[in-house]
């Protein structure tokens, strides 16, 4: 019997030396490698967390997708992973292809099999990560946490978790979210990282010529 996808997942930071959080990678593997080298990332002692959207648009989507199988990487699901899973499950590919999924069609048959296997594993990606580190309690979701009060295992609209930009669009109100120290999101490409109270937006458009943002949580 197929297990339901987890919504929430917890990470205990004391298991790791350093914890790094990456903005949307979108197939930009070389940018990620350079950033990890610069921060002296150690895959045996450190953890890399992705805010989702490791695939599509960039040059190395398959390699980035396969990163999720490494013991030193974890991620929340992004809307692009969800589009890919939905496309393969339904065989309705048009939405995914219009949004950067054409790399999959260009793969050789054996590579498509590898991609399908990796995307099947994405069914186990949580929508929301709660990370307990030496710098506090961090909540990570791809686009938004669609409530003004965070609670572990609270029912929230998962479509908004993957797609919503409304909170960022209302940033002039300056309202944060209670229930954790920091909230981290990607999804909306920005020229630079945006911090509004305890809300942090770190998709800085690596695939569009911007820098890939890497944040040290511990």
Swiss-Prot record:
Cofactor(s) it depends on: Mn(2+)
Residues that coordinate or bind Mn(2+) 1: 24, 26, 53
Pfam families per record: Metallophos
Active site location: 80 (proton donor)
Effect of residue 26 to L: Loss of function
Its biological purpose: Plays a key role in signaling protein misfolding via the CpxR/CPXA transducing system. It also modulates the phosphorylated status of many phosphoproteins in E.coli, some of which acting as major chaperones. Has been shown, in vitro, to act on Ser, Thr and Tyr-phosphorylated substrates.
Similarity comment text for this entry: Belongs to the PPP phosphatase family. PP-1 subfamily.
Full protein name: Serine/threonine-protein phosphatase 1
Organism of this sequence: Escherichia coli (strain K12)
